[in-house]
From Swiss-Prot:
This is LPS-assembly protein LptD. The gene is lptD. The keyword tRNA processing does not apply. It is found in: Cell outer membrane. The keyword Signal applies. Keywords: Cell outer membrane, Membrane, Signal. Residues 1-18 form the signal peptide. Together with LptE, is involved in the assembly of lipopolysaccharide (LPS) at the surface of the outer membrane. GO terms for cellular component: cell outer membrane; transporter complex. InterPro entries: LipoPS_assembly_LptD, LptD, LptD_C, OstA-like_N. It comes from Shewanella sp. (strain MR-4).
Length: 765
């Protein structure tokens, strides 16, 4: 016999825990409860969701008194279900008791228990002898008593939990009491013991852990390392969730060879579209340096939009000494960074014009000669498409004041204006863009040193420019290595004329020579900045061919180009630094190709056809059979590269190998090795192993790298001896479920070092 009761009473509170979406890796670790899920009836109205439905084999009920249900009792209310052998409902006191093969389920978790006592009037319930499983996750455990309070919280007494599979419990947290706040989505734990491999390793009198991705104040995962530079090192970050729009991370970092190194990061949101970060780092009395100086860093970054038109940007960094990034692991810059950026900018944008004001001060570590400061620079740009008879009009201008910390250095104010007319012609088979520009620049220079007597107090420079750039697109279908391809042939040419004017009376404030890669051949200038505008009468010829497979994916791209100088640049006769008196530029070629489904080749060369010398070569060969498998070989050669620390010319000939490979489903290897062929020495070695299971992850890595040591500018007058190379061992451990999945990942291992995976030929800067 089946009897159904429909009551407008609420049995148990609805827990409001976060519905976390498991990651792809986590989905393979989901632990399902040993009892089947009770399927809710779909399409119920809001009123029906509140009704109680009881189904049983037998029942004995009298109105206003007890109702007794026996035999496969199923109690349902919306998404909540209770199954038991026997249940008693006291209608007078609104007490509901159930026992015998008891199962409680909702959309958050499943609980099996010996007995259940629920007070429907106060929305409280107690389950004894409980085992619980969180749906869609791997969190599960036991509790002597599990209480659901009237304010939607959970209290577990004499309990434990883990994220490991039941047949392989690598770690287990046992606690006297756990309280889970369903609204705040965090838990409090009292008198806890952490067992690893069933061995108690930690006693924790009190701790808090998040039960979702919601931010929560508390300690983050510690890390351990040892190195020849800092000795044994341990850090224990503490996270403070101040407010929804503010948070702070404080990291005490103890180094046995140096002392206590503290790092503080404050992050904030300002309105809907602005954000910023403030970093403070401090090491008092560095024991590794003579004089035990204090070392510090402070950095402020801010960016965002005030409204749809206004933009703001700020970035300011200061450090105590030249070797700060080289000696200490900063959260702001890497060891190879030797420039500190100090920039502030406010911009306003309209459809056809924009204006910005900018201040900039770049500090170069380890160099006595300091760059000029931009204090300030105002830019105004105007553009009008189809201004007249298909002509586009543009106007670019800037007003810059150059200052310097050294009072002996000359200073200057520069006004530059460049109106232009452009005729663009575009079609499916090619394009032709013609442009005329007039560049007017005025300087007002103040000389503070006799070494700059050759400079003029005022300079007015007017230079015309004509630029014609054209490209034609050819296409055909062809067969190569038994594969069908669609091939394009894209010849490109550019004629550039830039007038000449004597510029020896102008100082060098923000100008440097640009690199001559393939795309650089089609620039309209040889220098960054505006202090030198090289005269030109030249033609650039280039060609690009591409091969597309049957899926319209680019399989190969090859580009080749060179500049033909119709006359020597007169600017070279004024200053040997900018000399250009050859008939042609370097011959630049670039290749990117997919050799097969798994092999990829990238190469670039700059060859001087006048002197028959190789000016630059870069080659990378990648083997990527799957998303998580990589083997990369690289080589670069750069002759006569200026070492800014010694002002000497050096040749770079460097080979490298980088790999990332899973040994099995849980163990991953990442390593790299870079070798200096000229000096016959290794400049960086990195080896890392990472093991990750459903419930914990551990990484062990070894790092050996060359150091960039600068002259000391801190502490005593004694120049401290620094090792040319540094080596160290690093250990990271994450226990999943105690605060999230942790920071470990293969991608950051690939980029942990001097050389980036995507740009292995360049030092990170």
């Amino acid at each position: 016999m089946q009897i159904r009761y429909f009551l407008a009473l609420s049995l148990l509170p609805q827990l409001v825990l976060a519905d976390e979406s498991p990651t792809a890796s986590a989905s393979q670790c989901v632990i399902e409860p040993p009892v089947p899920r009770i399927v809710s009836q779909p399409g119920l109205s809001a009123a029906d969701q509140e009704k109680i439905r009881i189904v049983s084999d037998r029942s004995n009920a009298e109105m206003g008194k007890q109702a007794i249900f026996t035999g496969d009792v199923v109690f349902s209310q919306g998404d909540r279900h209770i199954a038991a052998d026997e249940a008693i409902l006291d209608q007078a006191t609104e007490q509901f008791d159930a026992n015998g093969n008891l199962v409680f389920q909702d959309n958050i978790f499943t609980v099996t228990a010996d007995s259940l006592q629920a007070q429907m009037r106060s929305n409280r319930a107690t389950l004894k002898g409980a085992q619980y499983w969180l749906h869609g996750q791997q969190v599960h455990g036991d509790a002597e008593k599990l209480q659901i309070t009237m304010n939607n919280n959970l209290i577990l007494t004499n309990t434990n939990f883990t994220t490991c599979p039941p047949d392989n419990v690598s770690w287990l947290l046992e606690a006297e009491k756990i309280k889970i706040n369903s609204e705040e989505e965090w838990g409090e734990i009292w008198n806890a013991k952490l067992r690893i491999a069933d061995i108690p390793v930690f006693y924790i009198p009190y701790m808090t852990v998040p039960v979702s991705d919601k931010r929560k104040t508390g300690f983050l995962y510690p890390s351990f390392s040892t190195s020849t530079t800092n000795g044994f090192e341990v850090s224990a970050p503490y996270y403070w969730n101040i407010a929804p729009e503010y948070d702070l991370t404080f990291t005490p970092n103890y180094m046995s060879s140096r002392g206590l190194f503290t790092k503080t990061e404050f992050r904030y949101l300002a309105g809907e579209a602005q954000s910023g970060r403030l970093n403070l780092e401090y090491l008092g009395n560095d024991q590794m340096l003579s004089g035990s100086p204090n070392r510090y860093l402070y950095n402020w970054q801010h960016q965002g939009a005030i409204d749809k038109n206004w933009r703001v940007l700020a970035n300011f960094t200061e450090v105590s000494d030249n070797n700060y990034f080289n000696d200490l692991k900063s959260d702001v810059n890497r060891a190879t960074d030797n420039q500190l950026s100090r920039i502030g900018e406010v911009s306003y944008f309209e459809r056809n014009w924009d204006i910005s004001t900018r201040v900039q001060d770049i500090k170069v570590l380890g160099e006595d000669e300091k760059p000029y400061q931009v204090m300030p620079q105002v830019n105004f740009n105007y553009r009008a498409a189809d201004f007249w008879n298909n002509l586009d009009f543009g106007f670019n201008s800037e007003l810059t004041n150059f200052a310097h910390d050294d009072s002996d250095m000359n200073t200057a104010t520069r006004l530059h204006m460049a109106p232009s007319l452009t005729l663009p012609i575009h079609g499916p088979s090619g394009s032709l863009t013609s442009q005329v520009k007039l560049m007017q620049t005025n300087y007002w220079q103040e000389q503070n040193n006799s070494a700059f007597d050759g400079l003029d107090d005022t300079v007015s420079r007017t230079i015309p420019q004509v630029r014609i750039n054209g490209q034609i697109n050819f296409e055909r279908f062809t067969e190569l290595f038994d594969q069908n391809y669609r091939q394009t042939l894209e010849p490109q040419f550019q004629y550039l004329y830039v007038g000449y004017e004597d510029q020896r009376g102008i100082g060098i404030y923000d100008t440097a020579q640009l690199q001559d890669d393939y795309f650089g051949l089609f620039r309209d200038r040889r220098f960054s900045g505006l202090d030198r505008i090289a005269d030109a009468n030249q033609v650039t010829l280039g060609v690009t061919t591409r091969f597309f497979d049957d899926h319209n994916q680019e399989a190969t791209k090859f580009s080749l180009g060179q500049i033909l100088y119709l006359q020597d640049s007169k600017l070279g006769y004024e200053d040997n630094l900018f000399e250009q008196n050859q008939s042609t530029s370097v011959l630049a070629a670039e290749l990117d190709t997919r050799l097969s489904h798994d092999w990829y080749l990238g190469a670039a060369i700059q060859y001087d056809t006048n002197s028959s010398n190789n000016k630059k070569t870069e080659v990378t060969l990648d083997f990527r059979p799957e998303a998580n498998k990589l083997l990369q070989l690289s080589y670069r050669y750069v002759p006569d590269l200026l070492n800014s620390n010694t002002n000497d010319l050096v040749n770079i000939s460097q080979a490298g190998v980088r790999g990332a490979w899973p040994i099995n489903d849980s163990l991953y290897f990442v390593g790299n090795w870079y070798y200096d062929l000229n000096e016959s020495r290794s400049i960086e070695t990195y080896t890392g192993f990472q093991y990750e299971s459903c419930c914990y992850a551990i990484r062990l890595s070894y790092h050996y790298r060359i150091k960039t040591n600068y002259d000391d500018n801190i502490g005593s007058a004694v120049i401290d001896e620094r090792e040319q190379f540094e080596s160290g061992v690093y250990l990271n451990l994450v226990i999943k479920g105690l605060g999230g999945s942790g920071p470990l990942g293969v991608s950051d291992m690939l980029n942990d070092g001097l050389f980036n995976y995507r740009k292995p030929l360049y030092l990170r800067n």
